[in-house]
Structure formats: C-alpha cells, structure tokens
C-alpha cells in the first residue's frame, strides 16, 4: 500500500511541475498568430489582450511602443500573413523567446510592404496570461 501511495505522490508532484512549466511551442505560436491576426484585423482591443501595455518593438523604421503600434495598425492594409519555421525557447518558467519567418501581403500608407520577414518576439507570463513584451522583424534579403 505504501508503494502505491508513493507512486501517487510522485505522479501528483510531476503533474504540478508540468502545470507550472513554460507553455509548449504550439501554445505560444497560437498567441503569436493571435497578435498578428488582431493587428491585421485592426482590432486594437484584441491586440492589447496579447501584447503588454509596456511593449517595445525594434524595426528598420525605428523603435516602437504600444501607442506607436496602435497608430501603425491604422496605416496597414494587411491582406494575409503566414508564419513558418517557428521556434520557441525558454529557460525560465515565465519567459519565452521565439523566432520565425512570416510572409506578409499588404500595404502601409498605400505602399507595398509585402515580403518575407525574419521575426522574433519575447513573451512574458503576467498574472497567468502570456503577453508579448518585445517584437522585431526585418525584411529578409533574397
């Protein structure tokens, strides 16, 4: 009987450890896609649910914060985006670093911005929710 109780305790401890561990790659990738989709849809309220209020971004055109991201959202007419080559890494339970390629079709202020971009984000778990705190992307050279 003691043996079975020991196994039950070990199983319980293992399941607790898994539940507080960093999310898997698929869960973070879904959050990443949600951020892109809300940006594409110009859904500022939805965007703020997955991107932290203290967000920072680094792009070829400059440094960005939440206010600038929301302003830039209005200038975009994104037709589509496709994320590929997605990787996620963490050595902390509440931080994830991602890198990926994203193919975008659309315009910014009427100018074509379509292309393939190399991108990366940093996600932080705050109050049980995963929020993007940093993002960067640069157009890939052919």
Regions found by a protein language model. Give the residues of each.
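Short, low-complexity N-terminal intrinsically disordered segments enriched in polar/charged residues
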Residues: 4-50
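Hydrophobic pocket/interface hotspot
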Residues: 35, 46-47, 55, 69, ...
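Short solvent-exposed beta->alpha transition segments
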Residues: 48-82
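A mature extracytoplasmic/lumenal domain signature
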Residues: 51, 61-62, 87, 92, ...
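Surface-exposed, charged secondary-structure patches
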Residues: 71-113
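Short beta-strand edge/turn micro-motifs at domain boundaries
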Residues: 116-141
């Amino acid at each position: 009987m003691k043996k079975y109780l020991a196994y039950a305790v070990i199983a319980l401890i293992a399941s607790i450890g898994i539940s507080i561990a960093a999310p898997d790659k698929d869960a973070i990738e879904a959050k990443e896609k949600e951020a892109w989709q809300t940006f594409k849809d110009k859904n500022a309220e939805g965007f703020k649910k997955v991107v932290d209020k203290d967000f920072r971004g680094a792009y070829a055109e400059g440094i960005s914060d939440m206010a600038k991201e929301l302003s830039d959202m209005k200038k975009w007419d994104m037709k589509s985006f496709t994320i590929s080559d997605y990787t996620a890494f963490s050595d902390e339970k509440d931080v994830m670093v991602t890198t990926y390629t994203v193919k975008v079709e659309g315009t910014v202020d009427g100018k074509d911005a379509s292309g393939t971009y190399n991108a990366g984000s940093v996600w932080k778990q705050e109050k049980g929710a995963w929020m993007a705190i940093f993002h960067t992307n640069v157009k890939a050279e052919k």
